[in-house]
């Protein structure tokens, strides 16, 4: 059985130094060009950004001091696209019901170097496994640690990203007891520690208020006038036994009308 990697002071300092060098090496404007979600997410709109952008108000780029709001942020494909493309967005407000996803957003915003230090160790240990059996054992050990709910914020974020990169098809699914149960994805050499993306996303998240709760509570945090809402609610479950959060169309429509 594998143990959760313990990052030594030396490893942490080396990671912080390397991360600082990485940030220095990123040219001006690179954030806008390369920013992208730090995880794969079911229903993500990364492949539809061009079509979605065409639906924006024609004068969006000329508007001043825009407040951009996403009540269902998920993987954040549209969020990072908007923040990287439109400097007139002075603030963004994002929300999601998944508390570990939101914890990961907050860690990337506030403590990216610590997150990278842990992910580097995980990536090195994962890639040092000799065969598929060892890879699976390592994955299951991390999944068990994640489900134990004993980890603190930075470790939670690292585990969340790790299982997203190494599970089957990047799925997030829990059983009736709230335990993450997606099987091993058999990836031999995944990019677990995407340092450049984490640091670029951290830059963009500096002007983002990050919320965790029901979407209907987001309106209370938004001042009237000037806010632009992007709604992308989660898909309804195909069966009554599927453990995905469902939203009916009526509450969402009522929310849109009240926020208008």
List where the protein language model places each region.
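Short helix-terminating capping/connector loops at secondary-structure junctions
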Residues: 61-66, 88-89
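Conserved proline-anchored active-site loop of SAM-dependent methyltransferases
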Residues: 52, 68-82, 94-98, 161-168, ...
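N-terminal export signals
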Residues: 2-6, 11-30
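Class I S-adenosyl-L-methionine-dependent methyltransferase module
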Residues: 84-206
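Glycine-rich helix-loop-beta junction characteristic of Rossmann-like nucleotide cofactor-binding loops
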Residues: 54-62, 222
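Class I SAM-dependent methyltransferase Rossmann-like catalytic core
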Residues: 34-51, 55-56
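A mid-sequence, solvent-exposed acidic-amphipathic segment
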Residues: 198-224, 229-230
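SAM-dependent methyltransferase catalytic-core segment centered on the flexible catalytic loop
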Residues: 228, 236-260
